[in-house]
Amino acid sequence: MTGAWIRAQGRQLGPIVLAGPILAGGAVALLGWFAADAWPPSQAMTLVTWLAQVFVIATGVCAAVALTGDPLLELHESTPTGFRRVQLTRAGLVTVSGLSGAAVMFFPLHAVRAWPHDQGWSTVASPTGAVVIVVVAALLTAAFAGTASTTTIAVVAAWMFLAMLWDPYVLPLPQQRGIPLIVSAGLLVAVWHRLGDAERNIAKVVTV
């Protein structure tokens, strides 16, 4: 995978999709920093908790747009690049942006002790793991459904699962992020095989 190929896919996605997670992470860090300076620690952490969820949703939406926003995406199957290569490259670009945004968000808030349930530098695994999970959810849904609306719904569902059903009750970080990431790795295998099915990829173009 050449640098020219990656740059070409980056241009297709556009600066908003590529920079969206980083900008969201920076905004959360800035607001959290101000809150930590002006409010009691408990109130600042509560605000950061909710703002961090906005960052995860923003990253997931960027992934959904990246993976479904091109109406001619499946036509790459008729070229030497292949549909799977295109989708995995685009998912990878959003993931890198999301991981960067998570770092931009976490480390300043960790420095001012405004990050909730902070267990040290390793706590960065919480937002970075969430990024990977929602991107995999977007990639999986885009691979099998292919529509922007369904993919966005899947991203929101993955976020709701983490924010409301998983993270509040599974506090040890290795289990909190390790188990969903193991499941995500298994789902990536299914995505790999589905995106490699040239007949289904071409059939999607024919039926559109």
Put a short name on every predicted segment.
Residues 4, 69-70, 135:
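A generic alpha-helix surface/boundary motif
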Residues 1-5, 83-84, 116:
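Juxtamembrane loop-helix boundary motifs flanking transmembrane segments in multi-pass membrane proteins
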Residues 24-64, 89-161:
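Secretory targeting signals
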Residues 15, 19, 76, 84, ...:
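Secondary-structure boundary/capping residues
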Residues 62-95:
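Helix-loop-helix units of permease transmembrane domains in multi-pass membrane transporters
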